[in-house]
Regions:
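Short, functionally important secondary-structure microenvironments
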Residues: 1-89, 96-154
């Protein structure tokens, strides 16, 4: 056992933590890993990627923000990350891009559902065309059709 491992083991024994505390710790570790992976592909977004402070919020099945905090469910992150880390990378970047483009604040008198859908489609279009490893996924037929139609409109 290395000195670092011994030190970590000693620290863990002296700091009894609850299951909930451990889950929060691991969830925030996952969020830092996601942010780091995105940073490796999008170095120019370093300030934006680190602008939100993490805030646990149980009962949500995705990531969320109001512009200051990144809301997450530890249970959701711990369940999804091992199976599909790219999905979480995309969710994180999706939120950041919404904030960069000021989507939450530019709705005005537009229909909220239509505005949200239009902004989501635009953000996903951008992410799908970034062609970076951290967010790359297979583009399904429906997405390709929607993108082709949008591109033809102009």
């Amino acid at each position: 056992m290395t000195n670092i491992e011994q030190s970590n083991e000693k620290r863990q024994r002296s700091q009894a933590v609850t299951q909930t505390e451990w889950e929060q710790y691991m969830a925030e570790k996952i969020l830092r890993l996601i942010r780091h992976e995105l940073y490796m592909d999008f170095r120019y977004m370093d300030v934006a990627l680190s602008a939100l402070s993490y805030q646990p919020k149980e009962g949500i099945d995705t990531l969320g923000t109001e512009g200051d905090h990144l809301f997450y469910s530890a249970d959701h992150l711990l369940r999804v990350y091992p199976k599909n880390p790219v999905y979480l990378n995309r969710c994180y970047l999706h939120m950041i891009l919404h904030l960069i483009f000021c989507h939450p604040w530019l709705q005005g008198s537009r229909n909220a559902a239509d505005w949200d859908l239009a902004c989501d489609i635009m953000i996903e279009y951008l992410i799908d065309h970034m062609e970076q490893t951290s967010v790359q996924r297979i583009t399904g037929l429906l997405r390709r059709k929607v993108y082709k139609r949008l591109e033809s409109v102009g």
